[in-house]
A protein has these predicted regions:
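Extended, alpha-helix-rich binding/interface surfaces that flank or overlap catalytic cores
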Residues: 1-134
């Protein structure tokens, strides 16, 4: 009963483009997804904190759902420590977007997209290697 009163409302999203552009991705799962980038905000869950990137995703052009990509500070700082530099905001966004594409490819159907996409340290390394970022 008190959970509703004690829970904090998430911060508003920042960084959304002035004009939303619908983009399309054909997943290896066989589904074609349309998505919009809605923005990002800090998140804190249990002992983990980082940045939440929110995308509005649809696979049928009729219904959509908000998909959160959670990039933990620990995963990003691990890469930064090993490479001796700080990731730019655009590189962090690229990691989130590529993690979203990976979820489109690996999850069996659009219904599975309702679960958060978690970015691990190994994901950060693999994504940045694929993008040619050192």
């Amino acid at each position: 009963m008190f959970d509703r009163w004690l829970s904090r409302k998430p911060q508003p999203l920042a960084g959304a483009p002035a004009i939303r552009r619908q983009k399309t991705y054909s997943g290896q799962s066989g589904y074609v997804y349309q998505y919009y980038y809605e923005g990002h905000r800090p998140y804190k869950c249990d002992r983990t904190s980082g940045t939440e990137y929110v995308f509005d995703v649809s696979a049928d052009r009729k219904t959509s759902l908000a998909v959160s990509v959670l990039a933990s500070d620990t995963a990003l700082e691990d890469w930064e420590g090993r490479h001796g530099r700080t990731l730019y905001a655009s590189e962090r966004y690229a990691i989130a977007k590529m993690a979203l594409f990976q979820a489109f490819d690996e999850r069996p159907n659009p219904g599975a997209m309702s679960a958060d996409v978690l970015v691990r340290a190994a994901d950060v390394e693999a994504i940045l290697i694929a993008l040619g970022i050192e």
